[in-house]
A protein has these predicted regions:
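Conserved RNase H-like, two-metal-ion catalytic cores of nucleic-acid enzymes
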Residues: 1-99
């Protein structure tokens, strides 16, 4: 299932889905590779598991994305953690570190 988040109902459905998981994959899509460029930005963020993916427009759903990183107490799996976490940090989103 691929779900593009477009409505508040989609957000509610996402958080319900998230509550059933203890581990999720996270990926970002950005405007380029260089996080130090003046016009660099995150465009999309995807959250998923082996069967489902949720796609968020970063600018539109920024508050929901911040809430996701604050509320979710499970494990984040990043394809390229160094880059994605740096890109999110550049946008003011802190990814919590857990041991």
């Amino acid at each position: 299932m691929l779900k593009t988040v477009e409505t508040v109902d989609d957000v509610v459905e996402f958080f319900h889905w998230l509550s059933t998981h203890d581990r999720v994959a996270v990926d970002t899509e950005t405007t380029g590779k260089n996080v130090y460029e003046f016009n660099f930005g995150v465009r999309l963020i995807q959250v998923g598991d082996t069967h489902s993916a949720w796609v968020f427009n970063f600018k539109r759903w920024r508050g929901v994305i911040e809430e996701f990183f604050t509320r979710f107490k499970g494990e984040f799996i990043f394809h390229n953690a160094n880059y994605d976490i740096h890109a999110l940090h550049r946008e003011g989103i802190e990814v919590p570190w857990r041991q």
